[in-house]
């Protein structure tokens, strides 16, 4: 019992701190809207406002556009700043991982659909981590629709999109399936 006491105290402290922890309150000045990119699929789009050329932030896997809440407003001094939460995450729609729903080209098409719906012309796209493949998909297929691409920590296969070897579709489908399993209360042990 003498050795268990410190562990019990530590466990109690962790539980107590968990009870005290609250969901962070987003106090950044932005508008939230939902853009329908295809039937039954709506994406959450944050608009931090600003003047100047458009700048669109795309978060990495598992994140939402709210990842950029801390610093996006600083860019609004020189740009009109947006953030898109990709399908399958956050408040955006969560379609089943089938029929290429999570391929790089499909995710890139979602970005283009948001741009079209909001009349955003030639933005600079800024993508973190796996969003690099979305950027590469858009930039390689429609270079005339973007003013530039900025890769943040995207030095993986995701940033080097090659339509002949679409890694992202398989990986995103697997990630989505596993997230759905966890949320349903079970995890596949494979």
Spans of features found by a protein language model:
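Conserved hydrolase catalytic core segment
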Residues: 80, 121-163
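Short, hydrophobic alpha-helix immediately C-terminal to the catalytic nucleophile
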Residues: 69, 112, 136-140
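Bacterial N-terminal signal peptides
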Residues: 7-18
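Active-site acidic short loop of glycosyltransferases
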Residues: 40, 49-52, 77, 116-122, ...
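Conserved HGGG/HGGXW glycine-rich cap/lid loop of the alpha/beta-hydrolase fold
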Residues: 41, 46-94
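Active-site loop/oxyanion-hole signature of alpha/beta-hydrolase fold enzymes
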Residues: 38, 46, 86-126, 130, ...
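Flexible "cap/lid" loop of the alpha/beta hydrolase fold
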Residues: 150-185
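N-terminal cap/lid segment of alpha/beta-hydrolase-fold proteins
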Residues: 23-42
């Amino acid at each position: 019992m003498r050795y268990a006491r410190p562990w019990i105290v530590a466990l109690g402290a962790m539980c107590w701190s968990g009870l005290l922890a609250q969901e962070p309150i987003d106090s950044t000045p932005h508008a939230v809207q939902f853009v329908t990119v295809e039937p039954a699929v709506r994406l959450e789009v944050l608009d931090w406002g600003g003047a100047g050329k458009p700048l669109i932030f795309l978060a990495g896997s598992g994140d939402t556009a709210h990842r950029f809440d801390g610093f996006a407003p600083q860019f609004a001094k020189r740009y009109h700043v947006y953030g898109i939460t990709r399908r399958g995450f956050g408040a955006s729609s969560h379609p089943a991982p089938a029929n290429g729903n999570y391929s790089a080209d499909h995710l890139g098409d979602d970005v283009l659909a948001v741009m079209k719906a909001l009349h955003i012309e030639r933005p600079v796209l800024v993508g973190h981590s796996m969003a690099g493949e979305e950027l590469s998909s858009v930039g390689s297929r429609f270079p005339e629709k973007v003013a530039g691409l900025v890769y943040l920590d995207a030095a993986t296969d995701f940033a080097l999109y090659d339509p002949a070897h679409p890694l992202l579709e398989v990986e995103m489908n697997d990630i989505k399936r596993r997230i759905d399993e966890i949320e349903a209360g079970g995890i596949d042990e494979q």
